[in-house]
Swiss-Prot record:
Subunit structure: Homodimer. May interact with ROPN1.
Gene Ontology cellular-component terms listed: cilium; cytoplasm; external side of plasma membrane; neuron projection; sperm fibrous sheath; sperm principal piece
Cytoplasm as UniProt keyword: no
KW ATP-binding (keyword) present: no
Record's protein name: Sperm surface protein Sp17
UniProt lineage: Eukaryota, Metazoa, Chordata, Craniata, Vertebrata
Tissue distribution: Testis- and sperm-specific.
Main function: Sperm surface zona pellucida binding protein. Helps to bind spermatozoa to the zona pellucida with high affinity. Might function in binding zona pellucida and carbohydrates.
Source organism of this protein record: Mus musculus
Amino acid sequence: MSIPFSNTHYRIPQGFGNLLEGLTREILREQPDNIPAFAAAYFENLLEKREKTSFDPAEWGAKVEDRFYNNHAFKEQEQVEKCEQELAKSSGREETPVTPFEESTEEEREQEEAAALKIQSLFRGHVAREEVKKMKSDKNENLKEEADN
């Protein structure tokens, strides 16, 4: 933060910006009439959640911000796992398992090649018919113009 025409810069504590971003997001989402009361309730809820899950979004946000500048903050695998668990709990939806890509058999490849060949030949035939139609219409227009003259 800076003041116009001043060389003074205030340092915002790590994680504080993340907390304010979360509050702002919720205020914009909920559109409360009494913003200070809503903010107090939001921070109370955040404190309760932090006590129950031992996950601090401010600390996590500070580490994310720190990672942007130097990549040493996320060497702790334990914190990342906690974050992933918290996100999985809060999202409320289950992730679908990833199925590995299976190679197609020789028979499937032959069928795919035959289908591709058929599609290509049909498209080429379509383009050729359109060209013939265009040539016929141009020829008819030329004959009409000659007949009119």
